[in-house]
């Protein structure tokens, strides 16, 4: 998958055409889901693809923002065994499926839900796993202009490049407000990120979707170590924060592995004290 191009053109869709996904494309999405990368390899995941008539009426009132279910021709139900970091893994896996669908011209959207047991009961699922995600899939009613010609990491960034990338991330926090260097609050500038080949990975991670578009992630660069912290606030719950963290890790990893090196996220806190505020929690780190 071309993560750079796919992320640049991805956006959540909540209004779908009454049109099923063609069989060839649906099979490609299902095949990808069976073998897609995981954040934690030894967590067993089961992904059920179900159609409108098997899901919408059953979950209306029980899933979706304030119980208003999103109408879509298809849904992916993510089930997972319960292990350490299984929710972050669900965010990573589920968003990977969304990106693959987008690459194939299929739109998607994460759907909120309150309780795994209720979803399992309403959908009559036979499983020993927990529902960790619901994703709508289909063709969006509104077309969106495609962005092409993403800039490669390590190149010389012109003013036109910067404007193009800035426009693609409109509505997002400025990168320097999201990436710190050496210590918390010390903003990383574009030149430093570019020299370290980290501008693109950070910029694309900045575009990751998040609950209520909170953009809760902050990255701290300490030499070759990248630390990811996520803000805890009253507007969201722990599940949403962990899903958001998993998605951000996927975006960063997808870009940096295409342009610089392979990485391995180490989940959990770090030993060193960086002066991180108490409302932020370190969720992972990696070496580049």
Regions found by a protein language model. Give the residues of each.
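Acidic, surface-exposed loops and disordered segments
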Residues: 1-288
């Amino acid at each position: 998958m071309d993560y750079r191009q796919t992320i640049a053109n991805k956006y959540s869709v909540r209004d779908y055409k009454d049109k099923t996904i063609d069989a060839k494309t649906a099979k490609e999405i299902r095949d990808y889901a069976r073998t897609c990368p995981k954040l934690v390899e030894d967590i067993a995941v089961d992904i059920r693809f179900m159609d409108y008539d098997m899901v919408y009426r059953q979950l209306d009132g029980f899933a979706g923002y304030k119980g208003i279910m999103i109408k879509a021709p298809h849904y992916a139900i993510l089930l997972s065994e319960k292990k350490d970091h299984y929710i972050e893994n669900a965010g990573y896996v589920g968003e990977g499926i969304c990106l693959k669908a987008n690459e194939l011209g299929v739109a998607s959207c994460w759907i909120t839900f309150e309780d795994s047991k209720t979803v399992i009961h309403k959908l009559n699922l036979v499983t020993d796993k927990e529902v960790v995600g619901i994703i709508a899939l289909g063709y969006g009613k509104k077309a969106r202009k495609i962005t092409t010609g993403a800039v490669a990491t390590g190149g010389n960034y012109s003013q036109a490049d910067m404007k193009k990338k800035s426009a693609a991330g409109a509505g997002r926090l400025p990168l320097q407000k999201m990436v710190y260097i050496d210590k918390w609050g010390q903003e990383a500038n574009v030149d430093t990120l570019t020299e370290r080949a980290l501008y693109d990975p950070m910029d694309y991670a900045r575009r990751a979707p998040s609950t209520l578009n909170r953009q809760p992630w902050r990255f701290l660069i300490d030499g070759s170590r990248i630390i990811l912290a996520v803000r805890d606030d009253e507007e969201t719950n722990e599940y949403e924060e962990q899903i958001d963290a998993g998605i951000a890790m996927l975006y960063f990893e997808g870009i940096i592995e295409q342009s610089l090196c392979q990485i391995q996220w180490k989940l959990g806190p770090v030993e060193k004290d960086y002066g991180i505020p108490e409302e932020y929690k370190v969720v992972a780190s990696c070496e580049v």
